[in-house]
Amino acid sequence: MRIGILGQGLAGTALAWQAHWAGYSVHIFDPGSQDGASWVAAGLINPIVLKRKRLVQDAHHHMATMDRFYARVTSELKTSLFYPGPVYEVLPDGASLRAWEDLALDTAFAPFIGPCHPLPHAALQGEAMGEVLQSRRLRVPHYLAASRSFFAREHHVHSELVTTLTLGDGRVQLQGQALDVCLLAEGYPGKWTESFFGPLPFAPTRGEGLRIAWDGEPITHALHKNIFLLPDGDGRYQAGSTYAWDQLDAGASEAAREEILTKLQGWFTQAVRVENQWVGVRPTMQDRQPRWGWHPAHPHLGYLNGLGSRGALTAPALSQRLLEALETASGS
């Protein structure tokens, strides 16, 4: 069976792997631009919404599926996909430390709430840092690029924008290619998805982040308080990100830069220099729930969208569900 996948962000790449493991001939259609939301994603795999101290919906299922998925991809690609170490929450005072310890008493949170540790850098302000068990950070650009190379070698990658997509006689014509199945993984704005499935309840969020560096003692831990501070392993760090719901097409802004630096300096007093600033638009839905499914009149057309800022965590399970539905429908 020939399966076409439109888009090669976190959603499309996960779908491609699931299709590959199911034995399909995979055709990826994606221009290869590295400025999409997935390419600038921090890659945090974290079952806890740290800002609100709540669990991601279906956190336990997503974490288990994610473990198996990335282990299998790692075996296929023969490369490391993760930065070392978990994520830590910076606890500013004794009250927040006690609140963290109380979370460990909640049976839902207990598998993910780790011990508290001393702050590892003199410029960090606070009482301690709490370890988020099972958390990690995906090397997103490396994962996407290595996966693209794999599919270019073992399957088919079409580095072009899709301008023609037609349905008929139980097949799909995509850029002149006759396919048995087509999966849309466009992210925002989802042109082809909305043309076939109708309007999606998008509430896209514009995020900005900084790549920073400093002279002196490094940090090797991934940290969160009101923003993240993430070591890239080369003496540089990602700091961010912001959330905005307007001016989605605008470039990097001075306001976002100042917001990030002000928040960071509230708990990390080290003097830093900004080396780069990035912008991405997260394909978030109004209710923050992803959307996926198969077309009622065209059962060979499906889609996956709306992963928001949790794509590294949720793409494995959601892509698996979509492919399982296809296999059930086809009787394979």
What are these regions (language model features)?
Residues 43-126:
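Dinucleotide-binding Rossmann-like beta1-alpha1 core, especially the glycine-rich loop
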Residues 276-332:
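C-terminal catalytic lobe of FAD-dependent flavoproteins
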Residues 1-11:
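Beta1/beta-strand and adjacent pyrophosphate-binding region of the FAD-binding site
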Residues 53-65, 130-146, 251-256, 313-314:
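Short beta-strand to alpha-helix junction loop
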